[in-house]
Curated annotation (Swiss-Prot):
Keywords: Cell membrane, Membrane, Transmembrane, Transmembrane helix
A Pfam family this chain is assigned to: DUF5658
InterPro entries from the UniProt entry: DUF5658
Compartments, as annotated in UniProt: Cell membrane
Membrane topology note: Multi-pass membrane protein
This protein's GO CC annotations: plasma membrane
Name of protein: Uncharacterized protein AF_1335
Source taxonomy: Archaea, Methanobacteriati, Methanobacteriota, Archaeoglobi, Archaeoglobales
Signal peptide: none
Spans through the membrane: 42-59, 79-98, 105-127
Source superkingdom: Archaea
C-alpha cells in the first residue's frame, strides 16, 4: 500500500480560488475549485442583457408601427436611444464598483440600495422586454397577460 502525503497551496486571484495539491513520487494532483461569480456581477450582467433586449424589442416594435408609451423614448432615434442605454448601464456599473469599495456604514447602505434598485429595475425591464417580444411575435393573449402582470405589480 502506498501512502501519500499531500499539501494544499491556496492561490487566490479576483474571485477564483485554485488549490494545487502536490503528492509524493512526483505526481501532481490538481483540484480546481472555482468560486462562483459574485451576485452583484451577475446582477450587472443581467441588467446589461435586459437593457439590450429592451433596446432591440423597442426599436423593432417602433419600426413595425407599434406605439411607444414613453414619450421621451419615442422622441429618440435608434442611435441616441442606444447611447442612452449604454450610459445607463455604464453609470450603474461605475456606481456599483465605487460603492463596493466603501467600508463605512453609509457607503454599505448606498451599495445595498443600488443593488436593490438594480434588481427591481432589472425585473421590471425584463417583464417589459418579454411583453414587447410577445407583441412582436403576435402572441394573441398579450393583453390578458398585461392585465395579470399589472395586477401582480400593483400587489408588490
Amino acid at each position: 500500500m502506498v501512502s501519500r502525503t499531500t499539501t494544499s497551496i491556496p492561490i487566490n486571484f479576483r474571485g477564483v480560488g485554485v488549490y494545487k495539491t502536490f503528492a509524493n513520487k512526483n505526481l501532481l494532483y490538481c483540484n480546481c475549485n472555482i468560486v462562483s461569480m459574485e451576485k452583484t456581477d451577475l446582477l450587472m450582467m443581467t441588467f446589461a442583457i435586459v437593457n439590450l433586449a429592451d433596446y432591440m424589442t423597442t426599436v423593432k416594435g417602433i419600426e413595425m408601427g407599434f406605439h411607444e408609451l414613453n414619450e421621451f423614448v419615442s422622441s429618440l432615434n435608434p442611435a441616441s436611444f442606444l447611447l442612452l442605454k449604454i450610459a445607463i448601464v455604464a453609470t450603474a456599473f461605475a456606481l456599483l464598483l465605487y460603492t463596493r469599495r466603501l467600508s463605512f456604514s453609509l457607503g454599505r447602505g448606498i451599495y445595498i440600495g443600488l443593488v436593490a434598485g438594480l434588481a427591481i429595475s432589472t425585473a421590471v425591464l425584463g417583464i417589459c422586454s418579454v411583453h414587447n417580444l410577445l407583441l412582436l411575435t403576435g402572441f394573441p393573449e398579450v393583453e390578458f397577460l398585461v392585465k395579470v402582470m399589472t395586477g401582480v405589480l400593483a400587489l408588490i
